Amino acid sequence: MEYTILILLLPFLSFLALGLGGKWMSHRTAGLIGTAALSVVAVLSYLTAGMYFSAPRLADGTYEALMPYNFKWLPFTESLSIDMGILLDPISVMMLVVISTVSLLVHIYSFGYMKGERGFQRYYAFLSLFTMSMLGLVVATNIFQMYLFWELVGVSSYLLIGFYYTKPAAIAAAKKAFIVTRFADLGFLIGILVYGYYAGTYTFSPNEMALAKGGAAMIPLALGLMFIGGAGKSAMFPLHIWLPDAMEGPTQVSALSHAATIVVAG
């Protein structure tokens, strides 16, 4: 499944193309580029799901976790490093289908809904970045990689909520959402650092976690801090105050934020 890298690469390339060259494109061209990229991503996601769930199961009846890509990015010690890659397990494969489907529908709907809007190309660039961030989050091979894409989701939300940047209400809503979720994400980051320090790994693998020496009593604290990040993205009390104002963005962005940022990331 080496082609799975395209699931992340295509929306990223779409973001670069529209972000850097969008002002020289017509609205129709920009919309077609963004929608075509997501159409291919959706097809690849469904293909991945079909191949993954049709493969023979392990002896205990579970599906094998696959890692088509993985490389060391930041090595700290011989046993502790931050890797980057793609992890395919039942949850991540299922979420690839959900994210690509919802995002593709939003891309298609936006083609008509945003017709004639100023900043049409910029909108599709942000939408591509948002989609890439969510896809990268669910296929992360470790907690730290997940955090990087988690923050990209937050940045993308900020850009889309504040799309109508000439409206003071939209700017205020974008800032509010960004700042409130940053408080939650700070807990997430501290939890990741505590977890890595005491567990000696950032991996999701139960086997490597079981081999980690010492610090077992600190793991629940680390996981509790990580939960704060999820609480912020999910708009749980008392970190829910940003959600009503998030409707200042385009209508379909609010739909994508509610369906994806809150449900998927949270």
What are these regions (language model features)?
Residues 1-266:
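...captures the hydrophobic TM-helix bundle architecture rather than a specific catalytic motif
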